[in-house]
Amino acid sequence: MGELDLLKPTIERTLNGTIQFGRIAMKPGKPTTFATIPTPNGTKQIFALPGNPASALVTFHLFVLPALRKASGLENPTLPIAKVSLAQDVKLDPRPEYHRVYISVTKEGGLTAVSTGGQRSSRVGSLRGANGLLALPSAKDTGIHSLKKGELVDAMIIGRLGGI
């Protein structure tokens, strides 16, 4: 939270809410906040997403969309996860990372993932064509600094798959 961010103090002091979490050890999306607010009709949920476009997209798919799907009564509120083969080497970050990719079906029926390019939170271009999010482990936790082309990685499907 920046020094000019008034959302958390407003939730706590003005709305008598509880911040359930205010920072997440992940990339992108570190400043994501989730809070609950008591109302006469029950507890209301508030998600505050980061301001950078890529961070907002990733945290929406990871947190907000599953919450909306659950509130709608869906039996399985999470988006599908599939094993995908990396089309190129991928460097790991010290934090767990959700890397934007384009996933397509291979001639053999497998899935392959191609990075959409630079993954900085502010890079809107990395959103273009992204239909998946690689769930990359932390380099700090694993002691591994990169994953190699051809390795299988879990990916969340966030759009229609492409074909080769």
Where is each model-derived feature located?
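ATP/NTP phosphate-donor binding region
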Residues: 1-4
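Flexible glycine/proline-rich
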Residues: 10-164
